[in-house]
């Protein structure tokens, strides 16, 4: 708890640092950004169209998902964010995406508007969900990267490895960017490397070496890459903290889950961790142990400090990394591992171990701790990144063998591989390690390791020489890469330099083995880490936390003892450094403990520089623990280490000091082996020495406290190393060698298991498989699989390792490593080296060697092996003796390098399994297979990129199956040819088994490639090679050996823990299944007891089943996570995986493996509930295993149950028991309970209740029956009513039909009349139109003529003007021509003048020249004369001289005549001489003169020549001038001619234009004329139309007048008819009265004839009774009395005055025609007035009667006459009379006229009226046709005039007047009429003026003259009355 305050502090620091440069500002609120850039204000315009460069799946619905190659349409961009997002649509979905993921193909707009973003822009575009927790884009996308990083990198692992070889920095940068976890892990690895490099620098004291190292240049780049990756990782971590557990699990237990766990533990243990880490050394060790990740972070910080001390490139790099890591991790800005640990717990653990060791190394003997740490780190890496571990183990074994002799040579490799270890930690990054680091490490390791590896290879050739060699090469490469990769290339480079320095230092410190271990660890770790970095970082972190927390809590006490020792060795991780420092301080003891703990605990993070001394024991322990540690959390590894150390001391019997020194290595390794093998949890429980706090601190506060812890651990590690360097050297070498082999075996197991994991796990698993196979041959048997054949061990490793990988590769490694560690510890490294370390390991582990004897579980061999492992010498000898164990072949480093470089896929698959690789190389042409696999990978990649999500798996399966068949066929062919070679090579296993395994490897390899591109990460990657012998033997043999080894261990060093010892031996098998061990490690806290170890042995068997591993591999992330999580959180997927594994362990290896497989399949999508069940299941398994472990060896269950796996057997038994229990409970127990549940009281109460309910029901039934009766009655009544109504309805329907028929007939007539009218009107209209058109045409013609005349005049004027203009143009042209002629003349004159002047000029010039010549001649003559004068003067002077001379000579010579002449001749006398002289002079003068004359002549001639020449030139010039003048004149002439031509052309053009204009004007004139004519025509036509219209108007007016006249006439005629009819009616009435009187008289007269009279009176009474009844109710007669009867009686009632309105309706029903008459009579309005009161009074009662029954109101006149007659005299007569009168007179004409309205009233009315009168509905049909039938115009006309007359008539009878209006709404009135409501509408409506208007027009238009006349008089009143009456009567 001491570290808790520090943890809190770091949390606050991280909170402040949370805002990493990479993170986007969260201040936007619920927005990604405050601004958006759009093409328009509404952001609805397309801005870009692009194509997706890669697949993108958004973190939530706000982001759009697309695949590579999809078209993306961008609508707007977000501005202001650190990570630029664009918003666009892909097909039908819309959302955001990073702009860098698309390539812009087209830009739609250049305009960009910055618009404020609204919160609604950041909701789900589909559904509108806005409840998002995070609006930090970098976090969201970072978490997305984290989730995708593992699968992506697993898919790209091979490619990454290739690229890594090219440039680890680049590969890391790439990985870091896409995968934050890898970044974190790399950062961790870098930190670890930094620590290691630091330590190496401290050891070397040569920073220049690091700088000189070729990779030193890489640090900056790596640091930058780390920073960016850290920034993104911070965001990712931030997101992870928010990510739910299920997400983290699905993310391969990605850093998200780890982060959550860390965060939880971080919060809970903040204070404790910080306190522990900072408070005390012991607490720091514990904290380091418990808080693996925190320790790593702290260690990385220490590494940063150490490297800062080195002050080389690393300080800057690490500071950057630390800052980046701290920022990104948000935990500690100074802790480099905070992010990395979170990202990649596994690798950070390894790195932390390495870094922890590095600080220790730098502080103390950095060389030794790093080498030791490297060994363990490589072991841990084997656990973590099994490939790395395998390489590490192989290299460790080889290096231990070689390092003893030439450990220094390999030191550079560890340095190089140091960086790689981390990368290897990640299975995903495993291939990355192959990059630069691998190359460097390979180069260095080859150089350094050549001798060592040869030795190692030689020593291991018996085992798996080629595999171990390949492993060494791999380890070298991995270590080289790790240095580059883990520190990122900068660190790798620096550390490679440091590694070289370290190599020297290690050599100096007899840590050759350490160096080799370091190199191997780095290589293997880097490779493993590269692959496993993602998974291991995730899983190891999760496992580390889960296992670390749980195991640490439980194991704190144990680990505390060992923790300090280990703490010294783990300066890099505060926890690790704390533990490791102790180990390192103690020397080999602490180193060994540290190494063994670190490998187990720090497997992923452990630097590759664990000292060889410590490496031996620590390797043994680390072999066990590291593997479990890998699978478990780093803390768990540490806990395991501590526990192992304690157990080793306690159980082994070595004193604690001894165990700390040499014994510490061996015993701790053994103890670790026991707890880890027997119970990886126990190892963890040993590590519990770390407090749970520390675990929590690791989880939660790993980073902050680790800073201090790092220093303390470094100090303690230094002290421990200084204290016991020799012991460390001795034991470290021995232990490291043995441990390497053990680890190799364990790793081989794990590696084989690992092959089957998911894509990521596959890489790791395959690497580890390679390692585990190699080590499996070497240490497989010595480990768990060692007992079994290497194949079996391989299978077991694969099985155990795969689940462990699924659960946590580290756990597997830890679980396996413990066994190996025990073997190693138990045996001296030298012995192990000499003897087959595998054998000894096998013996130590208690595993049976396939060759050695399948040692039964009960055999004491196991115990002996353990005892040997305890004694270390004996087991080592056994291992030596066991040829099968030594059989593991080693592959040369060169071959491994070539494989790494050229065969990335095969290398990544077999990275950790050299045995399988060796076997693979033996049978196949790997290059050809690699080509096929690469082709398959390319096809799968293209299919994965191009296929849609819903059919991706189908497409991938198609491609996979096509490639699979091809590759398998090729492999079979190769196998046929390679069998012979394989036999020649001679494998341990039988060739058939090897062939089967090789084919399995091929299939696994194919599946490995296939699931790198799996759409479902959890799909099983590769089915593990068929167990066959390997399966059966690993499971079965291992368990028995483990049991045996248990007694042995119990007897021997592990006697303290006899049960655990066998368990440990089983654990090797379990270590094959690290996931189970991790669970145990999870449960180790719960039980650190040895009994658990036996269960571990069961688990080992389970872990032996590779199929589970593959499933786990399917869920690689889950697998890793589950391992760590199982340890920490049983609810995680890891827990589920572990649970099955653990159950399987005790039940049977097969069952457990199956469970692991099933669990592995499930974990990826396992929800928290399932994870909880998984943890529960794991706990149950653990308890069961513990219980089984407590059983004696002879009683412990075997690997299977009579050939059946334990798991199904147990499950079946449990299910049977449960089902039986349920059955019995549901049958027997339930029956009894039911019997006793019910009592008599209850029954009686129930009966009473039932009775009550029955009574209530009876009451309800009775009430319902009553209701039913009532309803029945009601139904009957309603039926009766319905019947009545139906009868009435039938009657009304009949009447309606009749009325409709009459309406139709009337309508037809009206239509015909209307048609006639319309035709006539049309003809009139046409005629008028023709007239108007003619007039208009005439006017138009006139207009056109006038227009044409005006246009002609205008055209003429225009023509005249044109002519004038033309004349003007011509005159102008003449003037121009004249001017031109004048100019020409002037030009000629000027030319002549020019010529004259030129001539005169020439003459003057000639004269001038002649004068000049004469002047010159004179001057020449003067000169000649002057010359002559001078010559003469000379002669004279000479003569004078001669004379003087002669005078002077005369006296001398005295007449010597012989004197020579001047010319040498002897002259005569002087005189002669003088004369001669004078002659000579004269001759001379003459000649001179002659010469001068000749010269003058010559000069003259020359002058003449010159003059002639000049004249010639002048003449020529003149000629030229003349020619020029001539040409100029010609040109001028040509110009003038051209001008003339142009002028002529212009004239012509003007003429043409004029003509054209003239033509155009003419055209315009013609057009205008035409237009004018058209206008005139139109006008004339319009005039004609106007005239026609006027005529029509006149005609219409006339017609209107005529119609009015006709209406008046019709009115008059109708009135006359009415009067006549009324008169007739009155006459009839009088006749009737007379008849009545006659009857009375007859009665009186017939008094005698009483009987006859009585009879007659009776009859009359019968007939008169009705009329009497009718009289009192005049309105009822229709309804009360049938129409026929009513005629008589009604007539009687109306009798008083037929004119007054006697009803025709009664008679009409009897005879329809009668009604028409009455209708006509109804028009009697005038007669009424005549009749006076009678009419008024009678009609009033009659109106109602008529209205009620019929429209007889219109017919009252005649009807009353008949009635009256009938009344008075006899009904029969009255009827007859009424019939006669009505039929002929009124009915036909009147009804026809009014009914027809306007058109056909008369005829129609004649027929229909009787019908109408016959029934009350009669009048209705008339009004409908009249109103509806009559078209509105006609009807209106008719109505208008008619209404007025109607009103006129109606005033007499107000009733009629009022109702008259109602008739206008016939439809309404008709409705009630149909119902025959008697009084609803009285006759007045019938009389309504409606009928009046219609009849007159109808009469006018359509009625024949005869009827019209009749209708006219009656039409206005009677007809309308009829129609209205007909309407109202119904």
UniProtKB/Swiss-Prot annotation:
Principal place of residence: endoplasmic reticulum
Location in or out of the cell: Endoplasmic reticulum membrane
Region (Disordered): 144-263, 317-496, 547-737, 754-891, 1018-1149, 1447-1472, 1669-1796, 1801-1820, 1840-1930
UniProt membrane topology term: Single-pass membrane protein
Domain (SH3): residue spans on this chain: 45-107
Phosphoserine, modified sites: 229, 856, 1458, 1693, 1705, 1733, 1754, 1766, 1770, 1915
Disulfide bonds: none
Topology Lumenal: residue spans: 25-1171, 1193-1202
Compositional bias annotation for Polar residues: 197-211, 247-256, 715-726, 1040-1054, 1115-1127, 1677-1694, 1915-1930
Ranges for region SEC16A-interacting region (SIR): 1809-1869
Cytoplasmic side: 1224-1930
Summary of subunit composition and partner proteins: Interacts with MIA2. Interacts (via SH3 domain) with COL7A1. Interacts with the COPII coat subunits SEC23A, SEC23B and maybe SEC24C. May interact with APOB and MIA2. Interacts with SEC16A.
Purpose: Plays a role in the transport of cargos that are too large to fit into COPII-coated vesicles and require specific mechanisms to be incorporated into membrane-bound carriers and exported from the endoplasmic reticulum. This protein is required for collagen VII (COL7A1) secretion by loading COL7A1 into transport carriers. It may participate in cargo loading of COL7A1 at endoplasmic reticulum exit sites by binding to COPII coat subunits Sec23/24 and guiding SH3-bound COL7A1 into a growing carrier.
Protein name in the entry: Transport and Golgi organization protein 1 homolog
Species of origin: Mus musculus (Mouse)
Gene field: Mia3
């Amino acid at each position: 708890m001491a570290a808790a305050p520090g943890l809190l502090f770091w949390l606050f620091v991280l909170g402040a640092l949370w805002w990493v440069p990479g993170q986007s500002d969260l201040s936007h609120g619920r927005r990604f950004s405050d601004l958006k850039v759009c093409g328009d204000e509404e952001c609805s315009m397309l801005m870009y169209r692009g194509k997706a460069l890669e697949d993108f799946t958004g973190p939530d619905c706000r982001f759009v998902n697309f695949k590579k190659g999809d078209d993306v349409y961008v609508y707007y961009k977000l501005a202001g964010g650190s990570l630029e997002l664009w918003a666009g649509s892909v097909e039908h979905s819309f959302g955001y995406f990073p702009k860098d993921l698309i390539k812009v193909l087209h830009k739609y707009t250049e305009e960009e508007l910055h618009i404020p973003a609204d919160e609604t822009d950041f909701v789900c575009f589909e559904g509108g969900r806005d409840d998002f927790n995070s609006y930090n884009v970098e976090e969201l996308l970072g978490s997305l990267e984290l989730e995708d990083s593992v699968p992506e990198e697993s898919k790209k692992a091979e490619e990454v490895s290739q690229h890594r070889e090219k440039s680890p920095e680049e590969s890391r940068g790439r990985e870091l960017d896409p995968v934050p976890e890898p970044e974190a892990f790399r950062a961790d690895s870098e930190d670890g490397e930094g620590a290691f490099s630091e330590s190496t620098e401290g050891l070397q004291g040569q920073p220049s070496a690091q700088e000189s190292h070729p990779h030193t240049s890489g640090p900056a780049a790596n640091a930058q890459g780390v920073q960016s990756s850290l920034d993104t990782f911070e965001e990712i971590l931030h997101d992870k903290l928010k990510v739910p557990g299920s997400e983290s699990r699905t993310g391969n237990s990605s850093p998200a889950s780890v982060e959550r766990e860390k965060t939880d533990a971080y919060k809970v243990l903040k204070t404790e961790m910080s306190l522990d880490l900072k408070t005390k050394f012991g607490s720091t060790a514990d904290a380091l142990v418990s808080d693996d990740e925190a320790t790593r972070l702290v260690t990385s910080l220490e590494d940063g400090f150490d490297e800062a001390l080195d002050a080389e490139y690393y300080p800057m790099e690490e500071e950057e990394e630390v800052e980046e890591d701290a920022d990104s991790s948000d935990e500690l800005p100074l802790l480099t591992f905070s992010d990395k640990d979170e990202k990649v717990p596994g690798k950070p653990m390894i790195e932390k171990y390495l870094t922890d060791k590095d600080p220790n190394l730098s502080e103390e003997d950095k060389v030794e701790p790093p080498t030791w740490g490297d060994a363990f780190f490589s072991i841990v890496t084997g656990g973590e990144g099994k490939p790395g571990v395998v390489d590490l183990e192989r290299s460790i074994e080889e290096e231990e063998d070689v390092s003893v002799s030439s450990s220094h040579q390999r030191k550079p490799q560890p340095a190089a591989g140091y960086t790689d270890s981390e990368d290897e930690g990640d299975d995903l990054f495993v291939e990355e390690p192959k990059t630069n680091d691998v190359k460097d490490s390979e180069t260095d390791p080859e150089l350094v390791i050549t001798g060592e590896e040869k030795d190692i290879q030689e020593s291991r050739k018996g085992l798996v020489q080629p595999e171990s060699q390949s492993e060494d090469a791999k380890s070298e490469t991995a270590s080289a890469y790790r240095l580059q990769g883990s520190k990122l290339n900068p660190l790798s480079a620096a550390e490679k330099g440091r590694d070289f320095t370290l190599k020297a230092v290690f050599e100096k410190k007899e840590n050759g083995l350490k160096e080799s271990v370091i190199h191997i660890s780095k290589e293997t770790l880097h490779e493993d880490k590269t692959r496993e970095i993602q998974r291991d970082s995730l899983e190891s972190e999760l496992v580390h936390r889960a296992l670390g927390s749980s195991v640490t809590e439980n194991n704190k006490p144990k680990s505390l003892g060992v923790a300090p020792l280990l703490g010294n060795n783990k300066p890099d991780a505060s926890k690790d450094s704390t533990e490791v420092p102790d180990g390192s301080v103690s020397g080999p003891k602490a180193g060994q403990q540290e190494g063994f703990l670190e490998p187990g605990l720090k497997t992923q993070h452990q630097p590759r520089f664990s000292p060889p001394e410590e490496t031996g024991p620590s390797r043994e322990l680390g072999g066990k623990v590291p593997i479990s540690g890998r699978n478990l959390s780093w803390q768990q590894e540490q806990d395991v280490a501590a526990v192992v150390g304690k157990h080793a001391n306690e159980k082994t019997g070595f004193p604690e000091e001894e165990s700390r020194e040499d014994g510490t290595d061996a015993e701790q390794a053994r103890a670790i082996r026991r707890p880890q093998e027997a119970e990886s949890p126990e190892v963890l429980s040993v590590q519990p020495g770390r407090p749970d706090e520390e675990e929590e601190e690791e989880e939660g506060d790993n980073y902050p406290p680790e800073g201090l812890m790092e220093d303390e651990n470094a100090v303690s590690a230094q002290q421990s190393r200084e204290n016991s360097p020799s012991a460390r050297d001795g034991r470290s070498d021995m232990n490291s060698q043995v441990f390497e082999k053990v680890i190799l075996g364990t790793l081989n197991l794990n590696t084989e298991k690992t092959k089957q994991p998911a894509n990521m796990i596959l890489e790791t698993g395959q690497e580890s498989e390679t390692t585990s196979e190699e080590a499996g041959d070497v240490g497989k048997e010595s480990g768990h699989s060692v007992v079994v054949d290497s194949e079996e061990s391989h299978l077991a490793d694969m099985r155990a390792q795969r689940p462990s990988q699924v659960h946590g590769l580290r756990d597997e490694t830890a679980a396996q490593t413990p066994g190996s560690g025990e073997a190693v510890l138990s045996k001296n490294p030298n012995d192990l080296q000499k003897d087959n370390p595998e054998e000894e390991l096998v013996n130590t582990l208690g595993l049976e060697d396939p060759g050695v004897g399948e040692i039964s579980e009960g055999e004491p061999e196991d115990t002996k092996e353990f005892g040997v492992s305890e004694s270390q010498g004996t087991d080592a000898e056994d291992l030596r003796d066991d040829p099968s164990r030594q059989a593991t072949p080693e592959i040369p480093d060169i071959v491994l390098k070539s494989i790494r470089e050229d065969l990335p896929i095969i290398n990544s698959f077999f990275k950790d399994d050299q045995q399988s690789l060796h076997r693979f190389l033996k049978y196949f042409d790997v290059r050809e297979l690699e080509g096929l696999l690469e082709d398959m990978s390319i096809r799968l990649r293209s299919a994965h990129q191009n296929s849609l999500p819903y059919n991706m798996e189908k497409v991938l399966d198609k491609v996979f199956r096509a490639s699979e068949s091809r590759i398998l066929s090729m492999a079979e062919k190769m196998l046929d040819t390679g069998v012979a070679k394989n036999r020649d090579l001679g494998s341990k296993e039988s060739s058939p088994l090897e062939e089967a395994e090789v084919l399995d490897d091929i299939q696994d390899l194919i599946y490995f490639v296939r699931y790198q591109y799996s759409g479902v990460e959890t799909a099983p990657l590769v089915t593990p090679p068929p167990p066959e012998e390997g399966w059966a033997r690993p499971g079965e043999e291992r368990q028995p050996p483990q049991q045996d080894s248990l007694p042995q261990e119990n007897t021997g060093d592990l006697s303290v823990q006899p049960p655990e010892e066998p368990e440990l031996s089983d654990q090797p098998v379990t270590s094959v299944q690290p996931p189970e061990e991790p669970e145990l490690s999870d449960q180790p806290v719960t039980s650190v007891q040895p009994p658990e170890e036996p269960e571990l042995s069961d688990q080992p068997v389970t872990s032996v089943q590779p199929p589970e591993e593959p499933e786990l591999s399917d869920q690689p992330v889950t697998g890793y996570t589950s391992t760590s999580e199982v340890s920490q959180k049983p609810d995680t997927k890891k827990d589920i995986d572990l649970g099955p594994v653990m159950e399987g362990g005790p039940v049977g290896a097969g069952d457990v493996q199956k469970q692991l497989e099933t669990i592995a399949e499930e974990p990826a999508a396992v929800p928290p509930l399932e994870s909880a069940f998984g943890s529960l299941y794991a706990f149950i398994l653990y308890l069961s295993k513990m219980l089984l472990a407590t059983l004696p060896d002879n009683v412990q269950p075997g690997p299977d149950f009579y050939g059946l796996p334990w798991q199904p057997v147990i499950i079946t038994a449990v299910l049977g028991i449960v089902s039986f229990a349920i059955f019995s409970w549901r049958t027997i127990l339930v029956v009894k309970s039911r019997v006793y549940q019910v009592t008599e009281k209850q029954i009686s109460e129930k009966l009473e209740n039932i009775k009550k309910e029955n009574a209530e029901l009876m009451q309800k039934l009775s009430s319902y029956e009553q209701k039913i009766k009532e309803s029945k009655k009601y139904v009957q009544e309603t039926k009766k009513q319905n019947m009545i109504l139906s009868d009435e309805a039938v009657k009304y329907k009949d009447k309606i039909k009749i009325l409709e028929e009459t309406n139709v007939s009337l309508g037809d007539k009206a239509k015909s009349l209307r048609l006639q009218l319309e035709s006539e009107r049309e003809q009139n209209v046409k005629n008028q139109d023709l007239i108007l058109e003619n007039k208009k045409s005439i006017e138009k013609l006139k207009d056109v003529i006038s227009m044409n005349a005006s246009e002609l005049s205008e055209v003429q004027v225009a023509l005249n003007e044109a002519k004038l203009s033309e004349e003007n143009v011509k005159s102008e042209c003449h003037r121009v021509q004249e001017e031109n002629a004048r100019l020409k003349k002037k030009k000629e004159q000027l030319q002549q003048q020019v010529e004259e002047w030129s001539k005169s000029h020439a003459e003057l010039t000639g004269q001038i020249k002649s004068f000049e010549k004469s002047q010159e001649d004179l001057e020449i003559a003067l000169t000649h004369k002057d010359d002559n004068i001078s010559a003469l003067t000379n002669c004279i002077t000479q003569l004078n001289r001669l004379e003087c001379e002669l005078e002077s000579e005369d006296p001398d010579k005295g007449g010597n005549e012989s004197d020579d002449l001047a010319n040498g001749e002897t002259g005569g006398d002087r005189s002669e001489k003088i004369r001669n002289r004078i002659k000579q002079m004269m001759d001379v003068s003459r000649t001179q003169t002659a010469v001068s004359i000749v010269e003058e002549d010559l000069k003259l001639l020359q002058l003449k020549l010159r003059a002639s020449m000049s004249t010639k030139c002048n003449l020529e010039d003149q000629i030229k001038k003349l020619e020029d003048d001539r040409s100029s004149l010609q040109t001028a002439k040509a110009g003038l001619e051209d001008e003339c031509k142009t002028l002529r052309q212009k004239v012509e053009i003007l003429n043409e234009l004029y003509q054209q204009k003239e033509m155009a004007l003419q055209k315009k004139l013609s057009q205008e004329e035409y237009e004018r004519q058209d206008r005139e025509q139109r006008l004339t036509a319009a005039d004609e139309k106007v005239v026609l219209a006027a005529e029509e108007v006149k005609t219409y007016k006339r017609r209107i007048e005529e119609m009015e006249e006709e209406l008046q006439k019709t009115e008059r005629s109708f009135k006359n008819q009415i009067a006549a009819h009324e008169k007739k009616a009155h006459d009839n009435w009088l006749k009737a009265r007379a008849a009545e009187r006659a009857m009375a008289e007859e009665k009186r007269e017939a008094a005698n004839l009483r009987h006859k009279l009585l009879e007659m009176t009776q009859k009359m009474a019968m007939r008169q009774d009705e009329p009497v009844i009718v009289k009192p109710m005049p309105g009822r007669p229709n309804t009360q009395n049938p129409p026929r009867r009513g005629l008589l009686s009604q007539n009687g009632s109306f009798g008083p005055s037929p004119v007054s309105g006697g009803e025709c309706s009664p008679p009409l029903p009897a005879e329809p025609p009668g009604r028409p008459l009455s209708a006509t009579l109804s028009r009697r309005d005038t007669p009424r007035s005549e009749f006076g009161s009678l009419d008024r009074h009678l009609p009033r009662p009659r109106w109602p009667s008529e209205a009620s029954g019929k429209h007889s109101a219109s017919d009252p006149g005649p009807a009353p006459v008949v009635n009256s007659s009938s009344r008075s005299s006899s009904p029969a007569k009255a009827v007859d009379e009424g019939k006669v009168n009505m039929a002929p007179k009124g009915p036909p004409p009147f009804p026809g006229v009014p009914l027809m309205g306007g058109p056909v009233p008369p005829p129609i009315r004649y027929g229909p009226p009787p019908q109408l009168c016959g029934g009350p509905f009669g009048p209705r049909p008339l009004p409908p046709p009249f109103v509806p039938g009559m078209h509105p115009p006609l009807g209106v006309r008719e109505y208008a005039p008619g209404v007025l007359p109607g009103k006129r008539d109606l005033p007499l009878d107000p009733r009629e007047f009022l109702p008259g209006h109602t008739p206008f709404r016939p439809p309404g009135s008709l409705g009630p009429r149909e119902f025959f409501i008697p009084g609803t509408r009285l006759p007045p409506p019938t009389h309504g003026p409606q009928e009046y208007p219609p009849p007159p027009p109808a009469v006018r238009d359509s009625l024949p003259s005869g009827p019209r006349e009749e209708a006219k008089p009656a039409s206005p009143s009677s007809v309308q009355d009829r129609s209205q009456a007909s309407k109202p009567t119904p």
